[in-house]
Regions:
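N-terminal signal peptide c-region/cleavage motif recognized by signal peptidases
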Residues: 16-19
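Catalytic glycan-binding domains that act on GlcNAc-containing polysaccharides
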Residues: 44-268
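Mature N-terminal segment immediately following signal peptide/propeptide cleavage
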Residues: 27-50
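Bacterial N-terminal signal peptides that target proteins for export
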Residues: 1-8
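Hydrophobic helical h-region of N-terminal Sec-dependent signal peptides
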Residues: 9-13
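Cleaved targeting-peptide boundary
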Residues: 21-27
Length: 268
């Protein structure tokens, strides 16, 4: 995940999660046992939790990274976009538009989100799935952040959602790999968004946001559509569609970058 998006995430503690009872801090193994009980109450099987938590330990690198983040952003839009949207990325995005033209037509018809917006997000997040999707075991990362007492309820909710991804059969534990806040896949969904918005668009019976391009793009479109994005309208700053993208990223500068990139892709 891009660090601007991570900085926004870690400042937001109002994500809708259930009231969770596991107590943060203290002995990590005791905390994991409490989380396992929470998971069982939420319908997660003992087989899943047992496999997920066997030998799990805190990851000091995750805490160190998290505590180093700066939650202010001082670049202008012009400075920021120049580092994120260059000729190579624009050309790569146009190639994706051509390669997946039929898929984009299906997605636009079902979800009403224009293809250039989806390609812009895809490119910014992981360079169209070719870049860094994160290399950390999501369960360990989220258990570490949930045990830390600063945003424990937020990350306990994400941890339970990650377990549900495994329970549903969407991804096996070996593929549940992500970034420093537990983001997963080619457009870097948090586990709660994976559960809420994920779409099996390739028809294989599971939502795979790491390997399936149809699932990745349709799920991204579903998130935007569900939050009010409408085909044919402006997506520039001040528009209803620009506001709908808040669910993707609260940062105005990031949403302006998505809009700028999208326009470049279609020659506007």
């Amino acid at each position: 995940m891009h660090r601007l998006r991570l900085a926004i995430l870690v400042c937001v503690v109002t994500l809708a999660t259930p009231a969770l009872a596991a107590k943060c801090g203290g002995d990590f193994n005791s905390f994991v046992a409490s989380i396992s009980a929470e998971a069982a109450a939420a319908g997660i099987s003992q087989g899943v939790t047992g496999q997920a938590f066997v030998g799990v330990t805190e990851d000091a690198s995750v805490l160190n990274f998290d505590r180093r983040q700066r939650y202010t952003f001082n670049k202008s839009f012009e400075q920021y976009v120049s580092t994120r949207v260059g000729a190579g990325r624009i050309n790569g995005g146009r190639a994706m538009l051509q390669r997946h033209a039929a898929l984009f037509s299906r997605i636009e018809a079902q979800f009403g989100v224009p293809r250039q917006i989806l390609v812009a997000i895809w490119g910014l997040e992981t360079d169209f799935g070719k870049g860094d999707m994160g290399r950390l075991p999501v369960i360990r990362t989220l258990a570490t952040l949930a045990h830390d007492c600063r945003r424990t309820e937020l990350f306990q909710g994400e941890l339970l959602a990650a377990l549900k991804i495994v329970q549903r059969g969407d991804l096996p534990l070996r593929d549940l790999i992500g970034a420093y806040a537990g983001e997963i896949g080619q457009t870097q969904f948090l586990p709660s968004s994976y559960i809420k918005y994920g779409v099996d668009f390739d028809g294989d019976g599971r939502v795979d946001l790491r390997h399936s391009v149809p699932d990745v793009l349709a799920s991204t479109a579903n998130l935007l559509h569900t939050n009010g994005f409408k085909m044919g309208g402006s997506y520039e700053e001040g528009s209803a569609n620009f506001e709908a993208m808040r669910e993707w990223n609260h940062a105005t500068i990031y949403r302006k970058t998505i809009a700028y990139f999208a326009d470049q892709l279609v020659g506007r």
